[in-house]
Amino acid sequence: MNKRGALLSLLLLSASVSAFAASTESKSVKFPQCEGLDAAGIAASVKRDYQQNRIVRWADDQKKVGQADPVAWVNVQDVVGQNDKWTVPLTVRGKSADIHYQVIVDCKAGKAEYKPR
């Protein structure tokens, strides 16, 4: 009986560690043309990209927030950047939880990296 309990505890621990590691990985994606945009334009682009392209493809985000169409927002005053490279804090709110990303956008390269905060 003790061996079963120890084995079950080990399995649960390893599953939770791997789930935590998966949730802290950053996700690199292609990003639409954004050269020349200001902070408000970048904020709108990041929000639109997440709602139209990311949530529909990232099942782990849907599961975490508890819905397929969560609310996403960016506080424009927190957006910083120069030379078409931006850092955008994105908050995604669902029925079950919130997800916070630090989105690093490189407009010239056409890429963005979503890093969990």
UniProtKB/Swiss-Prot annotation:
Localisation per UniProt entry: Secreted
Ranges for domain YebF/Cmi: 30-117
* InterPro entries, alphabetized: Uncharacterised_YebF (IPR020236), YebF/Cmi_sf (IPR038703), YebF/ColM_immunity (IPR025603)
Q: Which cysteines are joined by disulfide bonds?
A: 34-107
Main localization, broad class = secreted
* Sorted UniProt keywords: Disulfide bond, Secreted, Signal
Signal peptide positions (record):
1-21
Q: Does the keyword Transcription apply?
A: no
Q: Does the keyword Secreted apply?
A: yes
Q: Which domain of life is it from?
A: Bacteria
CC terms in the record's Gene Ontology section: extracellular region
Family (UniProt): Belongs to the YebF family.
- Protein name stated in the entry: Protein YebF
Protein's organism: Salmonella paratyphi B (strain ATCC BAA-1250 / SPB7)
